[in-house]
Amino acid sequence: LPEINRRLREAGSTKRYKNLLGVTLGTGFGAGVVIDGELLRGDNAAGGYVWCLRNKKYPEYIVEESVSIRAVMRVYAERSGDAGARTPKEIFEIAEGIRPGNREAAIAAFEELGEMAGDALASAITLIDGLIVIGGGLSGASKYILPALLKEMNAQTGMMDGARFGRLQKEVYDLDDEKSFAGFARGEAVEVLVPGTNRKVGYDPCKRIGVTFSKQGANRSIAMGAYVFALNHLSK
């Protein structure tokens, strides 16, 4: 949050964020939630449980079956016909074209993970209304995961009368892309006149959030988070 808010300030934006959904993509699909600078623990210490949300492709299963290391391995095997136990690292190298294998199947394995994660995160962020930061062992394949994730989050839904609108009541931006971040920072800021006065105030009607990938890795982020959490509770 401090990093994104710093970039917004340097870009001349008055927009600031206080809420965050932190996600890990790896052995499983984990998450943590920060609301107004405070870690959401939940009344049963179960806050941020995204792993057990419904799976878009397989509604009878949890989403983690499509957002995890085992999911990438399964989808690659299904699409390529390769019965060998390929690791996510090997599948990524196949996608990059530096290891023999079915490149289309490798890319599709990460894209499907992105789509399924995007569906779950769209549901979660509807309630949280904040930024999303992604880490974990699979985040190294972000170039294949993120486009599908953003496409899913920015997809449309509708009503029985035929009305169509964004599934989220806000636009989702890629904060690691300079052009996308510029649009995110710019928003739709305008000045409005305060009724009964000659004074104008800034107002930005553009609802928007962003997705970024962790630059320091999941382990360091978790350690730093635990440290700050402990410091904040020393005086309580």
Put a short name on every predicted segment.
Residues L1-E3, G30, S139-S142:
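Short, active-site-adjacent cap segments at secondary-structure transitions
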Residues L8-T14, N55-K236:
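ATP-binding/phosphotransfer module of carbohydrate and carboxylate kinases, centering on a glycine-rich
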Residues G42, A46-Y49:
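A short acidic/small-residue loop/turn micro-motif
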Residues L1-L20:
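Conserved phosphate-binding catalytic cores of ATP/NTP-utilizing and phosphoryl-transfer enzymes
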Residues L20-T24, V133:
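Short glycine-aspartate micro-motif
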